[in-house]
Curated annotation (Swiss-Prot):
This protein's name: Maturase K
Pfam families registered for this protein in UniProt: Intron_maturas2, MatK_N
PANTHER family linked to this entry: MATURASE K
Gene this protein is translated from: matK
Single Gene Ontology MF annotation: RNA binding
């Protein structure tokens, strides 16, 4: 496999036309066999399989032939198996074939995605998640509207297979993929549905499908815009799911899909900025309201024509940047534009022009966060702290660690805000909720708990906060922290509160469009 991957561009034609013979390589199934045993909950699937470390290659060959003739009783996924003890051996070999299928498809996909990235000489930037906040401060003040264009979460299996045919010419290699997708679609839990692409089950196969699906959406979208553009300065590209990036697009002219000679709408030097985290892209636009509506309409039409699916209107929503909250990444950050007067003068002091510009002034959305904490039973709707009853069965250390993690993530994210009063109010709510939870567990009072624990409450968070405020940026670090924004980029994972807040906002948007 390494040699096959190392060939790269030299044997790209051979890689596209002769993938199917790889399914009958014994080394491939040895790799998938070892990987399956590593991720399996048990060290050995069955006793009769433990006598031999290698797979039965004849059994694998028979299974490949049976996949296309299987009925719904043969389940390819362990977590969907209604009777895992009876069909464990069959499920084990099915998982091995699924792992092998993923390995075969990952090789040409990685080569294709890498070549597409290397071919973009005009790509303006390529950044990680830690550049989200500098991106907001650098780009958002020059925009007045944003589009929250969520990637569609489902697609028909046949449409997904046809997208693979665009860059894989070996049709027989896609037959196992088609069979796996249809088998998963026809499972009892997904009956009469399209295959769910979002990796709700954390398997390598579904992560690969998500990476490919997102890459395909973005590559087709940007390549379509480039072909329709009169300028060659258009930046476009496609990257895997683990990569976070943003683009700057200039001089876009979009034409009709059916008649390329007829222009739908034309843009003269627009400013469009694109950033994506997970499945939630954000497009910042500087222009009139008509421009924003046309961009939103184009995204809906693009998904309908290229992926043959009806995208709900609420999945592409637009709003003014200065009046609403924006999500990035997983949290909601409210932005306020403040005009600044910048005076400049020449050396000869001939004139002193006055420039009016905007700056991003992020503030803590205290009301939405309190509403989210009330939904998660940390406080009531008015912000009064209450005990978290569902955590009373945990140990004291686990309770302290959970509250500490919530506060640490919130503090690190909103540490760049000028307004700290709302942030400290959130700390007060979490502090008393933690004390009430411990008091409810030990059937005591808050005063007794605070007297016994003392500085143990949020000990890690307080130490982090002191360390953050005393960073040696200058001799006047304490004074500067009150005037300037310092983003503390230490977000190892998205807080569960952010995911819950995201779901609440999605439901509100869906209900708004239903009305």
């Amino acid at each position: 496999m390494d040699e096959f991957h190392r060939c790269g561009k030299e044997d790209s034609f051979w890689q596209q036309c002769f993938l199917y013979p790889l399914f009958f390589q014994e080394d491939l199934y040895a790799i998938s066999h070892d990987h399956y045993l590593d991720v399996s909950s048990s060290s050995r699937p069955m006793e009769h399989l433990s006598s031999n470390d290698q797979l039965s290659f004849l059994t694998v060959k028979r299974l490949i032939g049976q996949i296309r003739q299987q009925n719904h009783s043969i389940v390819l996924f362990v977590n969907c198996d209604p009777n895992p003890l009876a069909d464990r051996k069959k499920s084990f070999y099915s998982e091995s074939v699924l792992e092998a299928l993923t390995l075969v498809l990952e090789v040409p996909f990685s080569i294709w995605s890498k070549s597409s990235v290397e071919g973009m000489n005009e790509c303006k930037s390529f950044r990680s998640i830690h550049s989200i906040f500098p991106f907001l401060e650098d780009k958002f003040p020059h925009s007045n509207s944003i589009l929250d264009a969520r990637i569609p979460y489902s697609i028909h299996p046949e449409i997904l297979v046809r997208t693979f045919r665009r860059w894989i010419r070996d049709a027989p290699s896609l037959h196992p993929l088609r069979s796996v997708l249809y088998d998963y679609r026809n499972s009892p839990e997904n009956l009469q549905r399209s295959i769910i692409v979002v990796p709700r089950v954390n398997t390598r196969f579904f992560l690969f499908l998500l990476n490919y699906y997102v890459c395909e959406c973005e590559s087709i979208l940007f390549s379509r815009l480039k072909r329709s553009s009169h300028s060659r300065s258009l930046s476009h590209g496609s990257f895997p799911q683990r990569t976070h990036f943003h683009r700057k697009i200039k001089h876009i002219i979009i034409f009709s899909r059916r008649n390329s000679l007829k222009s739908i709408w034309s843009l003269k030097d627009p400013k469009i900025h694109y950033v994506r985290y997970g499945e939630r892209p954000i497009i910042a636009i500087k222009g009139a309201d008509l421009l924003v509506k046309k961009c939103r309409y184009y995204l809906l039409i693009f998904r309908q024509f290229y992926f043959h699916l009806w995208s709900e209107p609420y999945r592409v929503c637009s709003h003014q940047l200065s009046k609403n909250c924006s999500s990035s990444p997983g949290y909601f950050l409210r932005v306020r534009m403040n005009p600044l007067l910048v005076r400049t003068k020449t050396l000869d002091e001939l004139f002193i022009p006055v420039l009016i510009t905007n700056e991003m002034d992020p503030i803590v959305p205290i009301v939405p966060i309190i509403g989210l904490l009330a939904t998660e039973k940390f406080c009531d709707i008015s912000g009064r702290p209450i005990s978290k009853l569902s955590w009373t069965s945990l140990t004291d250390d686990d309770i302290l660690d959970r509250f500490d993690q919530i506060w640490r993530n919130l503090f690190h994210y909103y540490s760049g805000s000028f307004d700290r009063d709302g942030l400290y109010r959130i700390k007060y709510i979490l502090l008393l909720s933690c004390a009430k939870t411990l008091a409810c567990k030990h059937k005591s009072t808050i005063r007794v708990v605070r007297k016994e624990l003392g500085p143990e409450l949020f000990k890690k968070s307080f130490s982090k906060e002191r360390e953050f405020d005393s960073l040696p940026f200058s001799s006047k670090a304490a004074a500067r922290s009150q005037r300037e924004r310092i983003w503390h980029s230490d977000i190892p994972q998205i807080n569960p509160l952010a995911n819950s807040w995201q779901k609440i906002q999605d439901l509100k948007i869906e209900n708004l469009f239903d009305q």
